[in-house]
């Protein structure tokens, strides 16, 4: 099964997450199929904290990829920012 989830990066105490499409059997920070965006929970006011390629997200969902609950929350947050 293919899932859309967060992959952690950044330094200790300074998390940074990539939103990736990956096989469910692969570990969290392992190999992925495609990078769809990023989430920076420690972003300052003048920095971009969240970016998601909506067209690619729609494509992967149309071919059966499942989103993690956290990614679903971030997608709703991004939609609210766009409006």
Swiss-Prot record:
| A matching Pfam family | Ribosomal_S16
One GO molecular function term? structural constituent of ribosome
The reply on keyword Metal-binding is no
Q: Which PROSITE patterns match?
A: RIBOSOMAL_S16
Q: Which SUPFAM superfamilies match?
A: Ribosomal protein S16
Report the domain of life of the source organism. Bacteria
- Give the keywords, sorted: Ribonucleoprotein, Ribosomal protein
One of the protein's GO biological processes = translation
GO CC term (a single one): cytoplasm
Give the protein family.
Answer: Belongs to the bacterial ribosomal protein bS16 family.
Which HAMAP family does the record match to this protein? Ribosomal_bS16
- What is this protein called in UniProt? Small ribosomal subunit protein bS16
